[in-house]
Amino acid sequence: MNHTPIRTGESFALPPGSSKFTRLFWLATGRTVLVTGAFLLSALGMIAGPLTNPAALAPLSYKADWRWVKGAVFVPTKYVNEAQQWDEYDPVINDRELHYASIYGINCVRVYLHFDIYLKKKNALLKDIEDFLTRADKYSIKTEFVFFDDCWNQPDKDILSADYKYPAPIFGVHNSRWLVSPGENVRQHYAEYRDRLKAYVQDIVNAHKDDKRIAFWETYNEPNQSPETRQLMEDAYDWIHETGTTIPLTATGHDLPDKGFSGDPYSDFNSWHEYSGYNYTGKPDSLCSECMNRSSQTVPGIVEHFKSKTGFILWEFGIGRDNCRFAWGENRKQPRPDETPKPFHGMVYPDGHPWSVDDVKALLGAEAFAKAPLFAVEYYKDSNFAELAKKSVAPMIDFDLGTERGTGSPDASAGVPPENFSVRWRGAILPPTKGTYVFYADSDNQVKLFVNAKLVLNKKTSGHEEISKEIKLAGGQPAEVKIEYVHATGNPTLHISWSGPGLDRQIMTPINNASVQ
């Protein structure tokens, strides 16, 4: 979304109860910058020594090298928006898709929160945030949390009710159910909600104020120019600094004086969004916190452009029910009538395979990709493994696709139909010790599993059922596996797992990249 930059000479009233001594100064560029009392004292020589706490720095004075960031917006593919992501938090799908992200080279995730979910279930939200951070850290992934957002739709009035049902995505409409946070009712009654907004921010920050699993805080995504937004941004800036957190904060700003959003005066460091080409010429102390639309960019192009300049965060990791695979112009007035052959945003489908293997190669690099633990996958447009639609890779076989148009197929962009398709995976596993192993297939339809060319599992009928069988394997020696799945109708579901001596039951993962063997 595009907004008009701050205008020279424009001013606004400071909110009541601001905790810092503040003044507004004009830069030569005509931008308004917030300067804290700490900065004024420092400038006058009244504070000795280095200032390492972000709260003691002037806006945009925090310096870090962000070139390490290879990130992505993280909304699990089963959710229509960021509110549902937390309202119906699912540890299993979060863990699964964080695992995908780590295998594919993502080391930081941008995660949106929502004020209404804090109001609805504060204790559960705080618990789920800790669970998420634990899972992300398990995969060596840093997290940044976004508190507020001015983009897209207003929340439904009954979103706070315990039995609220999130609406289905609107086919052909970009980001069809994404929600602003907070909603207009809160913004228009700011004085009434201010203490609760403060508690929302500080309860989360206080629980993690020195948490090394968090890369930075983001008060506001793509803030517009309204007085309500600026007031909330300044308050949130102060509320976070009041906690004494050692983690820096930002709000979406810009990389050029005449382009972007209004977050710079309320940021410890500059972050901006780049959705048009490859234009950055700045330093690594600014971070591109969103980028990548395939009308003018590619993942390999972004990796190449930013690799020696600064870090980047892709919108987005998953290709799922939030509908960001459709383009900005495909809206409620002009929805796209058919499936897009090229996702506008997103990297990875719900079953774990990327839209383009080249995206993964770019993020990992050729050497790391060649060693990545990935199955080779073939998708067919028929149920007989005859009409090949696509070859790809996947870290595991663990999915429930549902029956919605577009996401009920493992890859609608490649022309795989939601019914009467087939998929084949090949790879190698490593039994840790000699002994008896059990293989499991939890499936809605027909599936075969071969180990070292021997048929071990053979589910011949439709209908959801788990089958299993024991097999003896030598320890420390790779075993070749092949899985063939045929789907007719209904919800495509397949979970392949195994267990054995020294191996608790777990989803089966390969030991090498079968696509390059």
Model feature map: region roles:
Residues 30-45:
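Bacterial N-terminal signal peptides
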Residues 292-368:
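Substrate-binding cleft of secreted/luminal carbohydrate-active enzymes
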Residues 1-29:
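N-terminal secretory signal peptides that target proteins for export/translocation
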Residues 77-84, 322-323, 385-390:
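Short, solvent-exposed loop/turn elements at domain surfaces
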